[in-house]
Amino acid sequence: LRHLLDTRQPDGGWRCEKYFFGRGPETDYSNPLPTLAALDAFRFTPLVNAEPALDRAVDFLLAHWVLRKPIGPCHYGIGTLFMQVEYPMRGYNLFMYLYVLSFYSRARKDERFLEALHALQSRLREGQIVVERVVPKLAGLSFCKKGEKSEPATERYREILKNLEADE
C-alpha cells in the first residue's frame, strides 16, 4: 500500500508508462483506469475515507468527468464507449467509475459524481441495469447479455445506492 501511495502523480492519480499514442500535453496527466483500479484496491483497506492522498485521486477522477477529453499515456476519455454500461465491469466506463467512487465519501458528496449517477440512472430499464457492452469471451453467459437486464449488475447498482445512504 505504501508503494502505491508513494507512486502517485502530482495530479493525484496513477499512471502506466506506455505511450501507445505518442507523447503530447494530454500524456502529462495520470491514467484514469489505473487510478480507478488503485482506488478499487484501497476501498478494502482502513485507508478508505481516511487517507488524504486518496482524496486527491478521487478529485482527479471527478475532474475527468468535466474534462472528458482523452488523457494520460493511454488516452482514456469520457465519450461513447465510457458511457456504455459494461458488465462484468473491467474497463474504464461509467458503471465501474460510479461503483468504485461510491465507496469514497468525498465522491458521494460531489455534484460531478451525482451528475454521473444521473447519467447511469437514465439508462436503467424498470430500475435495472441493462448491459450495453459485454466482455466478448463472456457473451454467452446469461447474466451479461447485451441489451438485456442483468440481476448481478443491478445488485452492483444497488450497492452504489446503499453507499450513498452512508452520508445521510
Label each PLM-derived region with a short phrase.
Residues R2, D6-R56, F60-E115, V130-D167:
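An alpha-helical repeat/solenoid feature that recognizes helix-turn-helix modules
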Residues Q121-E126, R133-V134:
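Catalytic-face loop-and-helix region of soluble metabolic enzyme cores
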